Amino acid sequence: ASIAKTAVGHLAATARESFASANNDLIKGKQWLSTLDNRTTPQCRIRDRLKYTLNNKPVGHSVPYLQGPGKIHFCCRSTETFILKSAKELGIDVRDISPAERASMDGVVAGDTTYREWFLRQPYTRQKQIVGESRAKLIRDGGMSPDEFYTDKGEWLTLKQLRERDAQVFRKAGI
């Protein structure tokens, strides 16, 4: 089943690439969408809602696209949505549509909710399931942000690397 899921995700990502290429007159970029639950990988959590050009270049951040959603790791459940050119960019005089909603394991959330925002609203027990007890303590008791668990290139830091960066936050969290 895992191999089939991975193959389907890879095929879907390849189809999206072909679609975007064929419609680049309407599409100005893409946005990574990660599944909002406790099984989402660190690689996908950091990339949730990040924008990229159609050539996979970061827009407003430095986290690389790598292989992209559906291809970045085995059993990847992330996807991407296309960012359409605005009506104004297309020469049409109408009001733009606001973002809608997106799904999470708890039901519908606002369409512009990022994984980070969703994560920070979760109870401590769920945060512990997602990032582990030490990292959950670093957030709750040490005052760390989930974003601090990554390099500026989106690489997941080990606890040892985090401690080397800021031992004080570990003491504050009682770790």
Please place each PLM-identified region on the residue numbering.
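Domain-core detector
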Residues: 1-73, 82-175
